Amino acid sequence: MIYGLLLHLGRNMWDPPANHLRFDEAVWREITEKMGRVGANMAVIDIGEGLVYPSHPELAVEGSWTPEKMRAELKRLRSLGVEPIPKLNFSACHDQWLKDYSRMLSTDEYYRVVADLIKDVAEIFDRPRFFHLGWDEEKEKTQRKTPNK
């Protein structure tokens, strides 16, 4: 059975986006430690602008976590018995964290960036069992074309 929680590292989903990470690390630690104590076994982490992506560092803001810091935090979560699951919200109504790319929906460049980010996060999270991509608000007609590959 999955007993988990959605945690937000990044918050730039809507306007106006901030140029810094709006995140309280002490609260994060308190919540995740309590998750381990009460037997929660999964944390879905909405990353957004909270990570310096190796392929697209231009998406970072002041205070974004480095890949090394993220890996260390993932190791700590796993030691608490909490499986970290990444979430990259690509929904067209929650994508301000993508900066200029959020205005390039359905273009080849957009799909290249999305593929790069998914690859970065899959590697940093050590090939997670699940990967949340957002899009739960989207309909099949929202995006006019799909990637060629």
List each language-model region with its residue ranges.
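Aromatic-lined carbohydrate-binding surfaces of glycoside hydrolases
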Residues: 6-149
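Extreme N-terminal starter segment of soluble prokaryotic enzymes
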Residues: 1-3
